[in-house]
UniProtKB/Swiss-Prot annotation:
The organism's place on the tree of life at top rank: Bacteria
Keywords, sorted A to Z: ATP synthesis, Cell inner membrane, Cell membrane, CF(0), Hydrogen ion transport, Ion transport, Lipid-binding, Membrane, Transmembrane, Transmembrane helix, Transport
Membrane topology: Multi-pass membrane protein
HAMAP family: ATP_synth_c_bact (MF_01396)
NCBIfam families, A to Z: PRK07558.1
Location within or outside the cell: Cell inner membrane
Name recorded for this polypeptide: ATP synthase subunit c
UniProt keyword annotation of Protease present: no
Site positions (Reversibly protonated during proton transport): 61
Subunit-level organization: F-type ATPases have 2 components, F(1) - the catalytic core - and F(0) - the membrane proton channel. F(1) has five subunits: alpha(3), beta(3), gamma(1), delta(1), epsilon(1). F(0) has three main subunits: a(1), b(2) and c(10-14). The alpha and beta chains form an alternating ring which encloses part of the gamma chain. F(1) is attached to F(0) by a central stalk formed by the gamma and epsilon chains, while a peripheral stalk is formed by the delta and b chains.
rRNA processing is among the record's keywords: no
Record-linked SUPFAM superfamilies: F1F0 ATP synthase subunit C (SSF81333)
Length: 78
């Protein structure tokens, strides 16, 4: 009986850890929406801001990748 409760709580913890991907997805969406809005207002400045776009996207995606990594660690190591 003890092992079943522990296994169940492990799955709940892994599921909660993956909720960080929601924030990552919202962040990437906001970054691209803001970039496209700015590019439509001032097309001549868009090429200069593309590097900033990809840096911001990479930082936002890193948080989602870290949350998946934590979920995998909870499932297979703990």
């Amino acid at each position: 009986m003890e092992g079943n409760i522990t296994d169940g709580l492990k799955y709940v913890g892994a599921g909660l850890a993956t909720l960080g991907m929601i924030g990552s997805a919202l962040g990437v969406g906001n970054i691209f929406a803001s970039f496209l809005d700015a590019a439509m207002r001032n097309p001549s400045a868009a090429p200069q801001q593309t590097g900033n776009l990809f840096i911001g996207m990479a930082l936002a995606e890193a948080l989602g990748i870290f949350s998946v990594l934590i979920a995998i660690l909870i499932l297979f190591v703990a």
